């Protein structure tokens, strides 16, 4: 395939293999394409796929979405549906602009089909994203999700107000909102998965738009069950399972050094655990809570198995980095009839 033979090797060589430089280059190029209707039409003709379904009241052209983190500030929004994605999630965005953690903070583990990141919610802030979305022609053509996180400078006891600030700024633009309380790269953030913190946060956010909670794969099942009790009691629209993991199981020998970098691991080694969490959530809620499955989807079969585990929708990030847009179409084709 063109992507795997030409595009990926070229990107992976940029600036001596700097993964974040390649990421930024790719998003800039896609942002340029997003301003070229003829180019978008060509991409849609090649990669577009129709497998519609309705989940939490939203109509999705197909059930394969772009995960948060790929286009944090929404720079290339019109390009992603043209590459076949049935929905797009931007962010994670915070109330305050922040630079994130020092570079280098993004590392590819190619033999394992994985990535380690410790980005730290680098983004231009909720206000800047709102201004960008306000200037875009609408509708986008696919549902737009917005992932919300806590600003690093905000103490945990003020987290609710911090999330509310972002939500209010972006409420009219997002079709759904993902509450990210599970990134391992913001100190103390995962404490917001605890019952009391999560209950207060959801009480402040649930209502007008569908709210989803993104959970960590590292939580034991009793903790996930407790989290789900809060989600059901507060009427969330769904769960995103899962975020990146702190575990390093399943890495190829050649990737051990890269795997030792601090941060969250995504990609193929996460597949089994992410699918286990999806299956547990599905069982624990008797299928009442829609699940967006994400983690380790690098082949169409991975997508099919995620749907079989109970996911209504899936998202790609690391698999897209390694396989390109052909994976989007193939993953959508692997979706089972809901």
Curated annotation (Swiss-Prot):
GO process annotations (BP): 'de novo' pyrimidine nucleobase biosynthetic process; 'de novo' UMP biosynthetic process
Pfam family, one: DHO_dh
Membrane topology field: Peripheral membrane protein
Location of this chain's protein in the cell: Cell membrane
Reactions this protein catalyses: (S)-dihydroorotate + a quinone = orotate + a quinol
Keyword terms: Cell membrane, Flavoprotein, FMN, Membrane, Oxidoreductase, Pyrimidine biosynthesis
Binding site for FMN: 68-72, 92, 147, 180, 214, 242, 267, 296, 317-318
Keyword Lipoprotein belongs to the record: no
Protein EC: 1.3.5.2
Cofactor names: FMN
Residues annotated to bind substrate: 72, 117-121, 180, 185, 243-244
Gene3D superfamilies referenced in this protein's UniProt entry, alphabetically: Aldolase class I
Enzyme class: oxidoreductase
Active site location: 183 (nucleophile)
PANTHER family found in the cross-reference section: DIHYDROOROTATE DEHYDROGENASE (QUINONE), MITOCHONDRIAL (PTHR48109:SF4), DIHYDROOROTATE DEHYDROGENASE (QUINONE), MITOCHONDRIAL-RELATED (PTHR48109)
Subunit structure: Monomer.
Protein name, as recorded: Dihydroorotate dehydrogenase (quinone)
Lineage: Bacteria, Bacillati, Actinomycetota, Actinomycetes, Micromonosporales
């Amino acid at each position: 395939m063109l992507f795997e033979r030409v595009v990926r090797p070229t990107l992976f060589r940029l600036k001596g293999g700097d993964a974040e430089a390649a990421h930024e280059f790719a998003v800039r190029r896609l942002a340029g394409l997003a301003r070229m209707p003829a180019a978008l039409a060509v991409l849609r003709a090649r990669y577009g796929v129709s497998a519609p379904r309705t989940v939490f009241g939203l109509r999705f052209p197909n059930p394969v979405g772009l995960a948060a983190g790929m286009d944090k500030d929404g720079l290339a929004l019109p390009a992603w549906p043209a590459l076949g994605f049935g929905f797009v999630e931007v962010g994670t965005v915070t109330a305050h602009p922040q630079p994130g953690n020092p570079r280098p903070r993004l590392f590819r583990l190619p033999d394992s089909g994985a990535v380690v990141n410790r980005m730290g919610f680098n983004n231009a802030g909720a206000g800047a994203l709102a201004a960008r979305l306000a200037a875009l022609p609408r509708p986008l053509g696919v549902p737009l999700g917005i992932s919300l996180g806590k600003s690093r400078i905000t103490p945990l006891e003020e987290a609710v107000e911090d999330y509310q600030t972002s939500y209010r700024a972006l409420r009219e633009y997002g079709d759904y909102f993902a509450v990210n309380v599970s990134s391992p790269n913001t100190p103390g953030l995962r404490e917001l998965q605890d019952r009391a913190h999560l209950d207060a946060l959801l009480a402040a956010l649930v209502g007008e738009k569908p709210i989803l909670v993104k959970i960590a794969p590292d939580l034991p099942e009793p903790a996930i069950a407790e989290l789900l009790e809060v989600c059901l009691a507060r009427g969330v629209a769904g769960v995103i399972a899962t975020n990146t993991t702190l575990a390093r199981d399943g890495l190829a020998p050649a990737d051990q050094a890269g795997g030792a970098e601090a941060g969250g691991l995504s990609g193929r080694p996460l597949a089994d655990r992410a699918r286990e969490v999806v299956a547990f959530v599905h069982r624990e809620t008797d299928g009442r809570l829609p699940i967006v499955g994400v983690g380790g989807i690098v082949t169409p079969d991975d997508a099919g198995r995620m749907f079989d585990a109970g996911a209504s929708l899936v998202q790609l990030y690391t698999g897209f980095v390694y396989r390109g847009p052909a994976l989007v179409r193939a993953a959508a084709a692997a979706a089972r009839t809901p």
